[in-house]
Design a protein with these regions (language model features):
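Helix N-cap motif at beta-to-alpha junctions
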Residues: 17-18, 60-68
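An amphipathic, aromatic/His-enriched active-site/gating alpha helix that lines ligand/cofactor pockets
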Residues: 64-84
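Short S/T/G/P-rich N-terminal loop/turn motif that feeds into the first structured element of a domain
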Residues: 1-27
Length: 99
C-alpha cells in the first residue's frame, strides 16, 4: 500500500541538542512506519531543517499506532536526557520537499 504526504498526518515534534540523536530518530521513524512510503515519516528533518527550527524535528506517520510505536521504541533505545517530546497532533500532514 502506497501512502502520500497527506496520509502522514499523525505528527510528533521533539527537541534534541544532538544531531546524532536526530539521525537515530530518523532511522527509528522509518523503522516504525512499516507500510506505505516510510521516508515521508522523516521528511524535513535534515540538519538545515533541525537548525532552522531551533533544534526541533517533526516526524509524521500515516497511522496513530506507528507514532505510538515510535515513542515506545525511542524511549526504550535512547536515554531520556537526549530528547524530549514537545507536541503531538493528529491533523498535521506532511508536505513534499518542494513545498
Amino acid at each position: 500500500m502506497s501512502t502520500t504526504h497527506k496520509d502522514h498526518h499523525f505528527s510528533i515534534t521533539l527537541h534534541s541538542e544532538d544531531l546524532a540523536v536526530v539521525g537515530c530518530l530518523r532511522a527509528l521513524a522509518q523503522h516504525c512506519q512499516t507500510s506505505g512510503n516510510a521516508r515521508i515519516a522523516w521528511g524535513h528533518t535534515k540538519r538545515p531543517d533541525w537548525l532552522r527550527a531551533g533544534k526541533k524535528v517533526t516526524f509524521r506517520f500515516s497511522q496513530h499506532g506507528y507514532r505510538e510505536e515510535f515513542k515506545k521504541e525511542a524511549s526504550r533505545l535512547l536515554p531520556a536526557a537526549l530528547f524530549r517530546v514537545l507536541s503531538e497532533r493528529d491533523d498535521d500532514p506532511a508536505t513534499p520537499a518542494d513545498e
